[in-house]
Amino acid sequence: MELGSSDVTSSGLDHAGLNSLGLPKPPALTRVVVAMSGGVDSSVVAALLKREGYEVIGVTLQLYDHGEAVHRKGACCAGQDIQDARQVADQLGIPHYVLDYEERFRRKVIDPFAQSYATGETPIPCVSCNSEIKFADLFETAQHLGADVLATGHYVSSKAEADGGRALYRSLDSSRDQSYFLFATTNAQLELLRFPLGDLAKPDVRQMARQLGLVVADKADSQDICFVPSGKYSDVIERLSPGAVVPGEILHVDGRVLGRHSGVIHYTIGQRRGLGLGAVGAGAGEPLYVIRLDAAKAQVIVGPRQALATRRVHLRGVNWIGPGSLQDMDEHGLEIFVQVRSTRAPIPGFLHAHESEIWVDFALDEDGVSPGQACVFYENDQPRARVLGGGFISATESALQMREMFPKPPNEDLLDTNESSDLVSPKRSAC
């Protein structure tokens, strides 16, 4: 049940005896910890819950050395954001705590991000931040505070199912849906999580903030990865893993050496501009894209756009939160919809599981696939679709037969493009 439901009586309970958070007691007896980032969304969540009579406690996480990020727009969990969260809490008259999670954030999020990027992957730190920090460590803190539930400002929904558990769903506002970043949420975590904004559109939330008089009502939305103040991921990698930056060759998929690079961390799979190759190519005016990054050999492999097409992805770290279990899957696979980039809509595909191997076959060619990114499973491609889980892409298989494109390649090893890509650097959506 969503906040403000017309089924809720004056007592704060619906006709089934549940409050708007699905708990069997009045709001005044329900303690809710709200993860307050200092942004509009989580501030509105805290304000709405307070207005409905819940006992609200605000908690803000200090996740990194935020000194250089104070007053910097487009980030979260920075110095100014902590001040904004505190100011909103003061407005609402609720307790507010700031927790220093810098060490664990570096250990669980920043260091793995740097290691993954150095291997030629395109990692998503927001997934591990949610699953390892917000929905794990913060959970423990919420329980220590005696909270009944933990509420966040994510644009997703969770609903009670007939079997007594809770399921995760995409938000009503597809343009703001954040379920891609929450696929690693476990069933146990869903039991205690609440997402009050799941059935609201962002313009409505911002209008609510203005009506509530919140000081952050017109604050800009977060866009960047919070711990990359300059917006350059390579700066973080060079600082944390200086030995990982090794110069090498830029090769065409047909084996020709086209130039040299100063480190694979400066390239993104699917990148077209800034390759430093001038007008070279297999043919006159042929656009070249980064097809594969081989960090072990310090090679950047480029080729035509057609080489980016992918039909199969192999997965690691799979989390299943759908009905039943993966072990019960039919040998022909499960027909689902999958999302391989945060900025694209889900596409049809088939999920397969055999022994320890899990993979997805796309029904259509997909160009925007990069190892390290997530492949998230959905029941359908509509708003409010149920999230079935997901995993991290470990490798992909090309939709093209490379040997047909290049019948006599000088170096067949280069054509084994088991890591495919995106046409442009994947946009980093806020998590």
Curated annotation (Swiss-Prot):
EC number(s) from the headed UniProt entry: 2.8.1.13
Location(s) in or outside the cell: Cytoplasm
Pfam families for this protein: tRNA_Me_trans, tRNA_Me_trans_C, tRNA_Me_trans_M
GO biological process annotation, one example: tRNA wobble position uridine thiolation
Region described as Interaction with tRNA: spans on this chain: 176-178
Active site positions, chain numbering: 129 (nucleophile), 226 (cysteine persulfide intermediate)
Keywords, comma-separated and alphabetical: ATP-binding, Cytoplasm, Disulfide bond, Nucleotide-binding, RNA-binding, Transferase, tRNA processing, tRNA-binding
Site (described: Interaction with tRNA): 154, 373
Alphabetized Gene3D superfamilies for the sequence: Adenine nucleotide alpha hydrolases-like domains (2.30.30.280), HUPs (3.40.50.620), Translation factors (2.40.30.10)
Region (Disordered): 407-431
Disulfide bond positions: 129-226
Protein purpose: Catalyzes the 2-thiolation of uridine at the wobble position (U34) of tRNA, leading to the formation of s(2)U34.
Family to which the UniProt record says this protein belongs: Belongs to the MnmA/TRMU family.
NCBIfam families given in the database record: PRK00143.1, trmU
UniProt xrefs under HAMAP family: tRNA_thiouridyl_MnmA (MF_00144)
Protein name: tRNA-specific 2-thiouridylase MnmA
Species whose genome carries this gene: Beijerinckia indica subsp. indica (strain ATCC 9039 / DSM 1715 / NCIMB 8712)
